Amino acid sequence: MSIQSGEILETVKMVADQNFDVRTITIGIDLHDCISTDIDVLNQNIYNKITTVGKDLVATAKYLSAKYGVPIVNQRISVTPIAQIAAASKADSYVSVAQTLDKAAKAIGVSFIGGFSALVQKGMSPSDEVLIRSIPEAMKTTDIVCSSINVGSTRAGINMDAVKLAGETIKRTAEITPEGFGCAKIVVFCNAVEDNPFMAGAFHGSGEADAVINVGVSGPGVVKAALENSDATTLTEVAEVVKKTAFKITRVGELIGREASKMLNIPFGILDLSLAPTPAVGDSVARILEEMGLSVCGTHGTTAALALLNDAVKKGGMMASGSVGGLSGAFIPVSEDEGMIAAAEAGVLTLDKLEAMTAVCSVGLDMIAVPGDTPAHTISGIIADEAAIGMINSKTTAVRIIPVTGKTVGDSVEFGGLLGYAPVMPVKEGSCEVFVNRGGRIPAPVQSMKN
């Protein structure tokens, strides 16, 4: 395959001018061989395994970044859901396990560690319940541990008892962490995937190898620049530009993943194609949608534009790699996207519109700040709505919502770094308390009649 000089310059520009980066190299680590009936032994086993398997990750990422001239922003670890690993200990709290994860992750220098998780789509074991009830204190006493709960799936339906508990857990976490920051590290899923390299929802699935490398790329700025510089007029042509750009982005991620796998002697798992924005100007998913012809993200037509973007990214990425997995689409985290922040501040991008957008994009209601006095049952209702979209449409959906204590609509909250800042958005006045308190399970949907 011949490479033109223009294509080489394009790749250089992607990094130099358009905020292209490999967002994360994540090592997934299986912890089943760490299980012990003694929680102290369990913690020591977990620490030893993480620090052994992950010891060279940061140095490898730095070497590859220098070798290829591509920034590798984060190095992360994901582990088997702790509710499964800690069950044999019969402990009444798993906060010490979260602290062990935090300590191990800091020892090897990674940015985040995920997997303080419970998979409860069909029911909660005593261990699942202990883990979920440990989340607020775990988020308060750790710095880089991320937590997730899978409350539903297309096969199992939605576990409304877990949804209720998740809402209460998020509310409690918001109350005991500064400006609700602990909630930025909690994701509630429907149809969670087992090979996600992105935080805060990463965990290492039970069907995975002992250790595996998953890579997440990011290039909203590259896609926007490609559209700006193209002469595409119809949406068919726009989709083609996005597809070709996604191909180029994916090839870089594939190269980095394969090289990291070889150097670390850990199998290469998947490449997640998700366009993950940052608060930096020029690195926004919202601005891509506006480049397609919307005056502001959130206006009518936004869901259609996002559907086009998401599908084109997947098509381009699939041609570039045989190892596409994870979430693979476009993320729409409000606080992490400069264009989304502006649209929300203008009052055009609302919670309702974001919910509609999640029906066609990669994940869900992400990094949304709501008033601190939002009741737990309202948070549970938002989670249930989002889970229903995922369940019916056979896709991953998720909620990462932050009730900010002491703040109300019109205020904003600063999270810093990649997490950015967010305007506090209004929630509905009506109550869903009776509905949420009913509990039980919303049955799995029929598959044969799709309307």
Swiss-Prot record:
Disulfide bonds: none annotated. SUPFAM superfamilies: PFL-like glycyl radical enzymes. InterPro entries: UPF0210 (IPR007841). Pfam families: DUF711 (PF05167). Homodimer. HAMAP family: UPF0210 (MF_01221). Belongs to the UPF0210 family. This is UPF0210 protein NMCC_1554. It comes from Neisseria meningitidis serogroup C (strain 053442). The lineage of its organism: Bacteria, Pseudomonadati, Pseudomonadota, Betaproteobacteria, Neisseriales.
